[in-house]
């Protein structure tokens, strides 16, 4: 899930693409911005078509990975069976949404729903804004599987390929699908939110796709998913903590069980990148620096409800204020991945590789310093209406 920091506290280009972009009209003219290591300047186009919201789309480089590197991923097939598929659970051992929700076939269904709604009444609107944003992000799952299938060397050419890496992609999608199911059904039963506006937002988001700037490269793609899965783990873990603080232990269990899934998935994706560092350290550190220079733009950054052109920014600002996902978390994830992949210990790199190594190893402290400076200049927050909660206002 993608969240940005409060725009009142962060005004830097450093966060423009990841979850903390500056609020600006999405119908702005084209503008140029820096892109990748060794690449030319790219542009961002603002488009408006009948079935999609106003949006910014980068003119991406396509198929940037040298074709010969596809062999690296073919060689990892046997390794994936013992190191990646182990992070999936058999379907019969997986939790399902119904395990946590009132049973519509039971005589006590209505009483169970009333109990759920009574607990939900004690939870403030700003929490529901964040929970809805998390759920909408989870519900755009078709986009995420599509994104993985754009990656050269690891795409599912038939839709049912039995190569182990592609078995992972489909099974990962199936596990993730339960997350949106659970949160969607909970929110429907809670009576606290405008389900039609939420469902419109989901349709807009899936129709808009996503713009991760991964260039069909599995190097970039798996670095992206490693970052994203850890971000989602942190976010769901914090919504679980907040639900417990508001007295809803059952909702806390729902968010917590989703966070546990995200942690397993994070482990798998970080192991893939760890293997790439072992096989091709120079190419992998260049890819890591590339993604961090472009900033990780998370899946829901094209979120729209038919009304608010800055919906994602506003949702993210609420999450930042509540401490569900913050600029500090962004820096912490980067620092975690640098350590997990032992980037500082890499040797035998090219000149460009050493520059990339220095860049990623020094970036987290720079982000924290920038956060401290901008927090000191923080302006007073404003209240903004959210259609998801019947246009009630929430402080950003």
From Swiss-Prot:
It is found in: Plastid, Chloroplast; Plastid. GO terms for cellular component: chloroplast. InterPro entries: FADS-2_CS, Fatty_acid_desaturase-2, Ferritin-like_SF, RNR-like. Its cofactor is Fe(2+). Fe cation 2 binds at residues 176, 229, 262, 265. Keywords: Chloroplast, Fatty acid biosynthesis, Fatty acid metabolism, Iron, Lipid biosynthesis, Lipid metabolism, Metal-binding, Oxidoreductase, Plastid, Transit peptide. It catalyses: octadecanoyl-[ACP] + 2 reduced [2Fe-2S]-[ferredoxin] + O2 + 2 H(+) = (9Z)-octadecenoyl-[ACP] + 2 oxidized [2Fe-2S]-[ferredoxin] + 2 H2O. Residues 1-33 form a transit peptide. The keyword Chloroplast applies. Pathway: Lipid metabolism; fatty acid metabolism. It comes from the Eukaryota. The keyword Hydrolase does not apply. GO terms for molecular function: metal ion binding; stearoyl-[ACP] desaturase activity. It holds the Pfam family FA_desaturase_2. Fe cation 1 binds at residues 138, 176, 179, 262. One of its GO terms (biological process) is fatty acid biosynthetic process. PROSITE patterns: FATTY_ACID_DESATUR_2 (PS00574). It is an enzyme of class 1 (oxidoreductase). Binds 2 Fe(2+) ions per subunit. Its EC number is 1.14.19.2. Homodimer. Belongs to the fatty acid desaturase type 2 family. Converts stearoyl-ACP to oleoyl-ACP by introduction of a cis double bond between carbons 9 and 10 of the acyl chain. This is Stearoyl-[acyl-carrier-protein] 9-desaturase, chloroplastic.
